[in-house]
Amino acid sequence: MAEHLELLAEMPMVGRMSTQERLKHAQKRRAQQVKMWAQAEKEAQGKKGPGERPRKEAASQGLLKQVLFPPSVVLLEAAARNDLEEVRQFLGSGVSPDLANEDGLTALHQCCIDDFREMVQQLLEAGANINACDSECWTPLHAAATCGHLHLVELLIASGANLLAVNTDGNMPYDLCDDEQTLDCLETAMADRGITQDSIEAARAVPELRMLDDIRSRLQAGADLHAPLDHGATLLHVAAANGFSEAAALLLEHRASLSAKDQDGWEPLHAAAYWGQVPLVELLVAHGADLNAKSLMDETPLDVCGDEEVRAKLLELKHKHDALLRAQSRQRSLLRRRTSSAGSRGKVVRRVSLTQRTDLYRKQHAQEAIVWQQPPPTSPEPPEDNDDRQTGAELRPPPPEEDNPEVVRPHNGRVGGSPVRHLYSKRLDRSVSYQLSPLDSTTPHTLVHDKAHHTLADLKRQRAAAKLQRPPPEGPESPETAEPGLPGDTVTPQPDCGFRAGGDPPLLKLTAPAVEAPVERRPCCLLM
């Protein structure tokens, strides 16, 4: 055969050839290749001949390495091939008929699935366990009943198979049987053995009762309930996978860990979801199991769930849990805001409703009005600040004109201004309030007794006469500096008793009553 460099060198020449020439050239190269291969094979055969004898001698002495399989694999492989002779040889050489693979499957299980009646008979004669359980507690009768092999079911029942055997799903052979004839055979056999519904329920409860006894014995011995068992699973994993509600409740009562993980990172909720145990899913979630817990493969309980009913239940529980978390988060944030603003007056006031705020203001003004209703002190009050004077000047009503025919009704001694103006004011406008002083009721002047009966014209004339007799004051007068006998002596002594900027007292707008009545003292403020 041509070398690589030779082939590369002739490529330009081959590219210029016609189709027929290229075909002939390829056939020539192929003939050379076959010739070279035949020569190499001949040389290889000549070299192998002398070495065969030592290899056979080494094999006879057991010095060469060989592939050997365990007896369980060999027996199951022969039974699966329905090789009666080979199985008989294995059983005759001392191989146990109950050998199982990694899933707990025995040769008898496999033959019941494959419907090998003669092989089943041979294994039973060799002493095979007729009630052998695999990893999911399936017996050979479970396998035969599920597959509907009537003659195998009859053979197993005749050999003493357990009709009440329960697998990990809580199913008995008759629960898994869909064939009518096979089901009739099972029910007839159960009736012949006197099996009732009570005995069936008692048989279903046996695994859980056994686990409950085991848990109680561990509790009495003070053993750790969180200790991992096979494959790193805890007792709660086992109870969740098998649907043992009472056992799981007992474990949770003694604070079994809901977040314990097995070797695959599965929590008990993963196991309950994978094996479709709806009551256990609800129980674990109610005790705080994490619906978003992830395994080593980043799988949540919802990811490993294969049953639609369980999946729907998980989604429902997840939605409820998320809604509850959102509600709790809003409540915590509200409490946090209230706690942080407890020392801030502004935030507290903003949280008060309008009705509550109005009631608060009304209560404050009512208390202030009660204070102002008290009799004024006999001693002169000190002059108020400029703020009080400014406030009184701003709140003082304009003086009435004589040409104005409108007469203002006396309202609790207040003159002028809108009756609603000072309803919610912080400071009482004393410059527009005039009231007869009870302290001056004993004065000999008849003006005090007859004042309520003067007409408006008489009152104006008296005010004008008083203005001519008294020089204009520079500021507010005290009760001691006021001249006796003047109408101004009858007013309540207050720092800013209504004098305007020019010193003129305001004119009262009063109307004479139709019937004489004693003077009544009324509060100076209108209480709403």
From Swiss-Prot:
It comes from Homo sapiens (Human). It is found in: Cell membrane. The modification Phosphoserine is found at S433. Pfam families: Ank_2. A lipid is attached at C525 (S-farnesyl cysteine). PANTHER family: PROTEIN PHOSPHATASE 1 REGULATORY SUBUNIT 12 (PTHR24179), PROTEIN PHOSPHATASE 1 REGULATORY SUBUNIT 16A (PTHR24179:SF30). Residues 40-58 have a biased composition (Basic and acidic residues). This is Protein phosphatase 1 regulatory subunit 16A. GO terms for cellular component: cytoplasm; plasma membrane. Residues 18-45 form a coiled coil. Its main location: membrane. Residues 19-59, 330-351, 367-421, 462-505 are annotated as: Disordered. The modification Cysteine methyl ester is found at C525. InterPro entries: Ankyrin_rpt, Ankyrin_rpt-contain_sf, Pase-1_reg_su_16AB, PP1_Regulatory_Subunit.
